[in-house]
Design a protein with these regions (language model features):
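Active-site cores that bind ATP or allylic diphosphates and position pyrophosphate for catalysis
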Residues: 114-295
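Non-catalytic DNA-recognition/assembly elements of restriction-modification systems
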Residues: 317-321, 325-329
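Long, low-complexity C-terminal extensions of enzymes
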Residues: 299-302, 327, 333-337
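N-terminal Rossmann-like or analogous alpha/beta NTP/dinucleotide-binding catalytic cores
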Residues: 2-139, 296-298, 302, 306
Length: 347
């Protein structure tokens, strides 16, 4: 069986470092291992419309922005197929068929859907398209025969529901659909990076993001104003690591080599944490260190992005070719499922 990855993002804005450590960095690593036969990266504009239908320009204008972020971060069109979801009608068709395999009550019980409904204040009036998001996601996964789906921990209920749909289809008809394996982020800090203000989620709407496209000055300003330990008032005060956003970011980004270059008084992050917990280490010092780490990590991405942005014709050509390739695969899957289910047997 071919090893295939499917992953992607909703184009509701430029990508930030939460996207980067949560999935994008891992995608680049997986792409470069050569261990997978196909890697499909989806710009999920159709799914983005489920809660942005009154503002389609927001979605449309960010397709190119997300594509820029993808390629700037290291996704290679020669190794990964980057495509636009709405330009593959077979995905909508698959979603329609799978809707018959799921009850409304099951969709309403999905923990991820419930959390997203609350966050978006949809309790009084839930868009049907939003409620059916897990079904659409299942169509995406199965259309490209994905064997591996990298997700954050908050998306696990969505993948479990996708497996349920796959299992039900295979039980009713023939076992032609593949149940995908789940691939979680590398470490706990990467599961869901908090915002710079210490909020549980980095969010464009909350204004607490560091974007991949941010300038060095913007990155520094955001880091220097970052939430730390409110009880760590004096340098001599013992500090807390748990819930300290600066240390969460260091967990996600820094290596021992960073200490050699920027903070040679310490061998590694564990030593820095121990000193902070004892007291005698100021927030300004660790913020300056984090700024050096982040500038080193993000500078090559920003520079590649600036170069790519000078030739958007190339970027859109990549999307066009990727979408054409992805549609061929989705059409093959749709044909197979119609044949298996005898849906068009008399035609």
């Amino acid at each position: 069986m071919s090893k295939i990855i499917l992953t992607g993002d909703r184009p509701t804005g430029r990508l930030h470092i939460g996207h980067y450590v949560g999935s994008l960095r891992r995608r680049v690593q997986l792409q470069n291992t050569g261990d997978f036969d196909e890697i499909y990266i989806m710009i999920a504009d159709a799914q983005a419309l489920t809660d942005n239908f009154d503002n389609p320009e927001k979605v449309r204008s960010n397709i190119g922005e997300v594509a820029l972020d993808y390629m700037a971060a290291g996704l290679d069109p020669e190794k990964s197929t980057i495509f636009i979801q709405s330009m593959i009608p077979e995905l909508t068709e698959l979603t329609f068929y799978y809707m018959n395999l799921v009850t409304v009550s099951r969709l309403q019980r999905n923990p991820t859907v419930k959390a997203e409904i609350t966050m978006r204040n949809f309790e009084a009036s839930i868009p049907a398209g939003f409620l059916c998001y897990p079904i659409s996601q299942t169509a995406d996964i199965t259309a490209f025969k994905a064997t591996t789906v990298p997700v954050g921990e908050d998306q696990l209920p969505m993948l479990e529901q996708a497996k349920e749909i796959v299992h039900k289809f295979n039980s009713i008809y023939e076992p032609v659909l593949v149940e995908p394996e789940i691939l979680l982020p590398e470490n706990e800090a990467c599961m869901r990076l908090p915002g710079t203000d210490g909020k549980a989620k980095m969010s464009k709407s909350l204004g607490n993001c560091i974007y991949l496209a941010d300038s060095p000055a913007d990155i520094k300003t955001k880091i220097m104003s970052m939430f730390t330990d409110p009880l760590h008032i004096q340098v001599s005060d013992p500090g807390h690591i748990e819930g300290n956003t600066v240390f969460t970011y260091l967990d996600a980004f820094c290596t021992d080599e960073h200490f050699e270059r920027y903070l040679p008084d310490y061998k590694n992050l564990d030593e820095l944490k121990e000193h902070y917990k004892r007291g005698g280490l100021g927030d300004m010092k660790i913020k300056k260190f984090l700024n050096n780490v982040m500038q080193e990590e993000l500078e090559p991405i920003r520079l590649r992005r600036e170069e790519l942005a000078k030739n958007m014709d190339y970027v859109y050509d990549v999307l066009k070719k990727g979408t054409e390739k992805a549609r061929q695969c989705a059409a093959q899957t749709m044909s197979c499922l119609l044949y298996t289910s005898d849906a068009a047997d008399d035609l």
